[in-house]
Curated annotation (Swiss-Prot):
It is found in: Host membrane. It is a single-pass membrane protein. Glycans are attached at N73, N83, N195, N209, N449, N459. This is Uncharacterized protein B475L. Residues 183-233 form a coiled coil. It comes from the Viruses. Belongs to the asfivirus B475L family. The keyword Membrane applies. GO terms for cellular component: host cell membrane; membrane. The chain crosses the membrane at residues 7-28. Residues 294-324 are annotated as: Disordered. Its main location: host cell. Keywords: Coiled coil, Glycoprotein, Host membrane, Late protein, Membrane, Transmembrane, Transmembrane helix.
Amino acid sequence: MDQEESRVISIFETLGAYFINIFYNFLYKNALYKKHSIVTEYQYQVKGYILGVKQNKKLYEKMLDSFYKYFCNITQINSKTLNFSNFVSTIVDSFIPKEYSQSISLEKKESILELLLCDYISNLGTFITTEKMLPFIIKNRKENYHKVTKEMQDYSLTFLLKKRMELYNKFLRKQAYVEPETELEETYARLSSYNRSLLHQIEELTSENKSLLADLSTLRKKYEKRQSEYRRLVQLLYQQIQRSSTSKSSYPLTKFIETLPSEHFSNEEYQKETPADQKEVVETELLRKQELLTSQELTSKSPNNYPVPHSRTIVSKPSDNYPVPRSRTTKIDFDNSLQNQELHTKNGFSEKDIVEFSQDKPEEENILAIKQDNPEEEDILAIKQDNPEEEDILEFNQDKPEFNQDKPEFKEAVLDIKENILEEENQDEPIVQNPFLENFWKPEQKTFNQSGLFEESSNFSNDWSGGDVTLNFS
């Protein structure tokens, strides 16, 4: 061990002896005068002393002055030779390297000494109040005096040497660090680094903002496109409903339009707030137009689009869907006549014999005369002449010469057929009106006479001298 190290250890042992005396003797005596238990009171005294030295400046100065006097007495150095500033320098120089001792001012040395002493007192007081040391300090003090003080001195010297090593390392690290020339340069360097970090954050936020603006523009375009499509669809829906409204029982068009959002509807009539009376007038007008459209659609969809009949006879060409007023001789009669002709053919009668038989009847001549005067009936006869079934029957009769027309059986069969026809003519058949014509043409009370025609006035029936008119339907 060199001389410098022995000097340092001597100073550390002197420092430890002073504070061990305070903890072991002075604080113990103060604990005896209190009413609480000695152990508890001693712990309070130790904690109070540590806090007082750290927090109370006057108590610290008083403690330091007492230690200065103790140090002078132990070292046998005259106080005039070792003043207080030299005392502080001597204690601090034992903890720091020599090359830094002269560069440190007295004020910094005093602050270093204060930190060292406060840290040392705190650790020593904690060690003394442990369960290992506290019983030896309170009980059997005389027997345990040397043992307790020896352990306290060893702990004190170990802690001070450890603290000296820490301060040495700090000064060496500080020597390797190049300090800035002035505080202004240090502040500038710190702010420059912070400014660079802020600029980097600004760039990131700017790029993110541009990306969000681009997304917003895309969404706005999509929104405008869908709004335009929505308005177009609403307008088409309005037009479609206006065309397809067909009856009074349908949902009123104005009520449906009022449920649509007005800001997306281009019809100005419904965007404006109109009075209730005006809305009723508009709705009534729309319903009237709907009825007119309905009637036109039904007329256009009717079979062959029949006009209202203007002649004295019923329409000669009925539709397949609606029945018409029938005369005493209808299509059913015509079918029956065809069946009778087939029956005559089977019985050996030809159509020629039937015609000769009918020439003896003046009533049938009148019927033919009436048919010749009626142009519409001529069309019906023309249709009958074109019937292929009758032509086939005539051809069949001509091919059968074996049938004798002068047989008495033939004449009896003709009489039976005539009686059947008269019985069928006397039967009253119901006259059915066409419901389709009733919707568009409602004449006054018209009646049908025995000829199967309806009478419009009294003069109409007087024009006919007699005879029945037979209507044949193909």
